[in-house]
UniProtKB/Swiss-Prot annotation:
Annotated GO MF terms: calmodulin binding; DNA-binding transcription activator activity, RNA polymerase II-specific; RNA polymerase II cis-regulatory region sequence-specific DNA binding
Record's protein name: Sex-determining region Y protein
Polar residues composition-biased segments: 174-187, 194-204
Gene that this polypeptide is encoded by: SRY
Membership in a protein family: Belongs to the SRY family.
Subunit structure: Interacts with CALM, EP300, HDAC3, KPNB1, ZNF208 isoform KRAB-O, PARP1, SLC9A3R2 and WT1. The interaction with EP300 modulates its DNA-binding activity. The interaction with KPNB1 is sensitive to dissociation by Ran in the GTP-bound form. Interaction with PARP1 impaired its DNA-binding activity.
Disulphide connectivity of cysteines: none
């Protein structure tokens, strides 16, 4: 069967709208077999979002802290969750081994049930996503300055790790130029004093 294609379907505006809609919708992988309607939806980012992640079995502290956390939260409604966790950790350390023993036994039972339910389970911790480094604005990343040394402009730039080297280099230039400037500034005074003494001798 042939389908009549409208010429407007290939206009630049329609093509741009279709490309944008394709980027927003989840990607669909179709099989090459034309008679099959099977498809696999991968999601917008390509990750397996439909599968539930298997949780680890609770340890003795988690078993004990479930009821204790609820109790502390009811007694102190204004207390933050982080403060509750610190308090529970301190209270757990203060318990004796005999007081902890029932919770270790319960955790062992839960671990056995988890092993029977998920025989091939392996704990894989989630890797923390690397945060992109914040880019400094152009004004702060590259600081250009100009200094006037012996009637000459020397531009220099502070950038990344070269700031210290550039600063020391400019300080060395300054220290080198100071005697010259001092000498040049003293020259008019010497000429003035010699001219004054010469004129005084002529008068006498």
């Amino acid at each position: 069967m042939f389908r009549i294609v409208n010429g407007e379907d290939y206009s630049p505006a329609v093509q741009q709208r279709n490309s944008l809609d394709f980027g927003k919708a989840p990607s669909l992988l179709w099989t090459d077999n034309g008679g099959s309607n099977d498809r696999c939806e991968t999601g917008g980012n390509g990750r397996e979002s439909g599968q539930d992640r298997v949780k680890r079995p609770m340890n003795a502290f988690i078993v004990w802290s479930r009821d204790q956390r609820r109790k502390v939260a009811l007694e102190n409604p204004q207390m933050q969750n982080s403060e509750i966790s610190k308090r529970l950790g301190y209270d757990w350390k203060m318990l004796t081994e005999a007081e902890k023993q029932p919770f270790f036994e319960e955790a062992q039972r839960l671990r056995a049930m988890h092993r029977d339910k998920y025989p091939g389970y392996k704990y894989r911790p989630r890797r923390k996503a690397k945060r992109p480094q914040k880019l400094l604005p152009a004004d702060s990343s590259v600081l250009c300055s100009r200094m006037h040394i012996e009637e000459t402009l020397y531009p220099f730039t502070y950038k990344d790790g070269c700031a210290k080297a550039t600063r020391s280099r400019m300080e060395s230039r300054l220290s080198y130029s100071q005697p010259t400037n001092t000498t040049s500034s003293l020259l008019p005074q010497e000429h003035r004093s010699s001219w004054t003494s010469l004129s005084h001798n002529r008068v006498t």
